[in-house]
Amino acid sequence: MSSKKSLYPDGRIPDRLPDGRPAVAWRSRWTEGVLPLWLVATAGGMAVFFVVGLFFFGAYTGVGSA
């Protein structure tokens, strides 16, 4: 966890400084903390398409394909 004091009641830390600059450098966003949700969702979606594709390929070429 971060040692920064939260300004919000739900524990979030603001992502911008008062002067408008990002609070965290762009390089640190990829090397610290949790993975971005869009990256996790993209990888999960690709995995689902791959597995479903394997089922269709197996039905076309495998046992029971006539």
Curated annotation (Swiss-Prot):
Q: Does the keyword Cell division apply?
A: no
Judging by the UniProt lineage, the source's domain of life is: Bacteria
- In its keyword annotation, does this UniProt entry include Translocase? no
Q: Where are the transmembrane segments?
A: 37-57
Q: What is an annotated GO biological process for this record, any one?
A: photosynthesis
Record SUPFAM superfamilies = Photosystem II reaction center protein J, PsbJ
Task: Extract the coiled-coil ranges from the record.
Answer: none
Q: For the region Disordered, give the residue spans.
A: 1-20
Q: How does it sit in the membrane?
A: Single-pass membrane protein
Mind listing the UniProt keywords for this protein, alphabetically? Membrane, Photosynthesis, Photosystem II, Reaction center, Thylakoid, Transmembrane, Transmembrane helix
- What does UniProt give as GO cellular component? photosystem II reaction center; plasma membrane-derived thylakoid membrane
InterPro entries membership: PSII_PsbJ, PSII_PsbJ_sf
Q: Where in the cell is it found?
A: Cellular thylakoid membrane
HAMAP family the record matches: PSII_PsbJ
| Protein family per UniProt | Belongs to the PsbJ family.
Give the quaternary structure. Answer: PSII is composed of 1 copy each of membrane proteins PsbA, PsbB, PsbC, PsbD, PsbE, PsbF, PsbH, PsbI, PsbJ, PsbK, PsbL, PsbM, PsbT, PsbX, PsbY, PsbZ, Psb30/Ycf12, peripheral proteins PsbO, CyanoQ (PsbQ), PsbU, PsbV and a large number of cofactors. It forms dimeric complexes.
Query: What is this protein's function?
Result: One of the components of the core complex of photosystem II (PSII). PSII is a light-driven water:plastoquinone oxidoreductase that uses light energy to abstract electrons from H(2)O, generating O(2) and a proton gradient subsequently used for ATP formation. It consists of a core antenna complex that captures photons, and an electron transfer chain that converts photonic excitation into a charge separation.
What is the recorded name of this protein?
Answer: Photosystem II reaction center protein J
Instruction: Please give the organism.
Output: Synechococcus sp. (strain CC9902)
